[in-house]
Amino acid sequence: MTKKQLHLVIVTGMGGAGKTVAIQSFEDLGYFTIDNMPPALLPKFLQLVEIKEDNPKLALVVDMRSRSFFSEIQAVLDELENQDGLDFKILFLDAADKELVARYKETRRSHPLAADGRILDGIKLERELLAPLKNMSQNVVDTTELTPRELRKTLAEQFSDQEQAQSFRIEVMSFGFKYGIPIDADLVFDVRFLPNPYYLPELRNQTGVDEPVYDYVMNHPESEDFYQHLLALIEPILPSYQKEGKSVLTIAMGCTGGQHRSVAFAKRLVQDLSKNWSVNEGHRDKDRRKETVNRS
């Protein structure tokens, strides 16, 4: 059996240069992430990792928060070089001293290496101590002029495979306003102005995924008119969401109970968007009334 290869990115660099944003970005890219890994534990940790998937990926922040960082990191990296089945890279995040000082002041943090409390002195000492590690790094990113969003985009371009770099998933869901708006929704649309199948006895206990309800909802002229305007609004903005580095866009369609109208609209929207995008369909409250009746 061919041994699976472990892909590791060691995230390090200057304090305040963006390591927190970086590790969150790697998580979005499908990496298993750990923040503040003591260097001495790294080889043992990698040995204990159970590789369950092809080409597993890890991203670990290793920095000066560990007191033994400067004394241990070189020996650890030498050991990793000789470890079979491991492909590892070092990502070093840097920024200009002036920008780092501004970031420390903005967060009201003191620099851990500034014995006298002067942030700039701590930064200069840190830069001197990290110089050998920076020279070893395969990827050095200067975040001086980067916003968090721009840093995420930069890392996605450098560490995603081609399929991931182009990935963008749309979640289309239905819900009932009476149960609350989904907290993770990016776009919310209200279809409560449309005729409600609930008031037709033969349709009341069905849902928008059932053909009779779907046809009833979508065959009304006002439904078709609204849907065409909805599609014309959504389709042109999807590339912009993708360009900005958003990995998941959640579109929520709501009606009163989330059983009929919103379900039908979500179903149709999925059918159309799926022609050009990766789309998942979900109906949060579709069966809620049925479950309530069964419990009573």
UniProtKB/Swiss-Prot annotation:
Binding residues for ATP: 13-20
Keywords in alphabetical order: ATP-binding, GTP-binding, Nucleotide-binding
Matching Gene3D superfamilies: P-loop containing nucleotide triphosphate hydrolases
Record flagged with keyword Transmembrane helix: no
UniProt-listed InterPro entries: P-loop_NTPase, RapZ-like, RapZ-like_N, RapZ_C
SUPFAM superfamilies documented for this protein: P-loop containing nucleoside triphosphate hydrolases (SSF52540)
Entry binding sites for GTP: 63-66
GO MF, one annotated term: GTP binding
Record carries keyword ATP-binding: yes
PANTHER family named in the record: RNASE ADAPTER PROTEIN RAPZ
Task performed by this protein: Displays ATPase and GTPase activities.
Record-linked NCBIfam families: PRK05416.1
UniProt similarity note: Belongs to the RapZ-like family.
Protein name per its UniProtKB record: Nucleotide-binding protein spr1424
